[in-house]
Amino acid sequence: MTEKKEMEVVKGLNVERYMGRWYEIASFPSRFQPKNGVDTRATYTLNPDGTIHVLNETWSNGKRGFIEGSAYKADPKSDEAKLKVKFYVPPFLPIIPVTGDYWVLYIDPDYQHALIGQPSRSYLWILSRTAQMEEETYKQLVEKAVEEGYDISKLHKTPQSDTPPESNTAPEDSKGVWWFKSLFGK
């Protein structure tokens, strides 16, 4: 078994430019998201204390599921884009903290496309500022993931609408049933 090289992460990430809405173009399946989720996206907002408010949303069977959390630099003294994200689960009774790694492996110079991973290579996200991504750009990000040692056979594209839904107009799955069902592979 060959040892995988350490992943390269972005250095000098401009956190303020990174804030805003990002659409999930593709990802590895996650037990924290419904298998049939569409229009999945994340919205990041800088808090006054320097942490980041995280809002992850997805739509499943016409209902909006969401979870909120926070992100912060894993090592405040490092210029590497290695963040920690923390969510409290389950969403309907948020009492258990779950912390994970969020490493920015690539960001284009205009901050329009990003590749996000973490050290175990169990999770991977391709993100875009727009709901659709040019195929050539997608292929370049997939190639970057391969270079970083990811098994892209697990990567699946996330269906995105041409006109993404608005958060305040969709019925909510307020009980977090999507999260609970996703634990059982539904």
UniProtKB/Swiss-Prot annotation:
Outcome of gene disruption: Increased sensitivity to sudden drops in temperature and paraquat treatment. Dark-grown plants die shortly after transfer to light. These phenotypes are associated with an accumulation of hydrogen peroxide and other ROS, which causes an oxidative stress that leads to a reduction in hypocotyl growth and sensitivity to light. Severe defects in basal (BT) and acquired thermotolerance (AT) leading to death within 7 days. Stronger sensitivity to tert-butyl hydroperoxide, a reagent that induces lipid peroxidation.
Motif (HPR (Hydrophobic proline-rich)): 90-97
Gene: TIL
Biased composition (Polar residues): 158-171
Entries under SUPFAM superfamilies matching the protein: Lipocalins
Consequence when changing P90V: Partially altered subcellular localization
Tissues in which the protein is found: Expressed ubiquitously at similar levels, except in dry seeds (at protein level). Present in seeds.
A GO term from the CC aspect: cytosol
Gene Ontology terms: biological process: cellular response to hypoxia; heat acclimation; hyperosmotic salinity response; intracellular chloride ion homeostasis; intracellular sodium ion homeostasis; lipid metabolic process; positive regulation of response to oxidative stress; positive regulation of response to salt stress
Segments for region (Disordered): 154-174
Cell compartment(s), UniProt: Cell membrane; Cytoplasm; Plastid, Chloroplast membrane
Record-linked InterPro entries: Calycin, Lipocalin_ApoD, Lipocalin_bac, Lipocalin_Blc-like_dom, Lipocalin_CS, Lipocln_cytosolic_FA-bd_dom
PANTHER family, per database record: APOLIPOPROTEIN D
Bilayer topology: Peripheral membrane protein
Domain remarks: The HPR motif (90-97) is required for intracellular targeting at membranes.
The keyword Membrane appears for this protein: yes
Pfam families xrefs: Lipocalin_2 (PF08212)
Species in which this protein is naturally found: Arabidopsis thaliana (Mouse-ear cress)
Sorted UniProt keywords: Cell membrane, Chloroplast, Cytoplasm, Lipid metabolism, Lipoprotein, Membrane, Plastid, Seed storage protein, Storage protein
Effect of P97V: Partially altered subcellular localization
CDD domains the UniProt entry points to: lipocalin_Blc-like
Family: Belongs to the calycin superfamily. Lipocalin family.
Role this protein plays: Involved in basal (BT) and acquired thermotolerance (AT), probably by preventing plasma membrane lipids peroxidation induced by severe heat-shock (HS). Lipocalin that confers protection against oxidative stress caused by heat, freezing, paraquat and light. Confers resistance to high salt (NaCl) levels, probably by protecting chloroplasts from ion toxicity via ion homeostasis maintenance. Required for seed longevity by ensuring polyunsaturated lipids integrity.
Official protein name in the record: Temperature-induced lipocalin-1
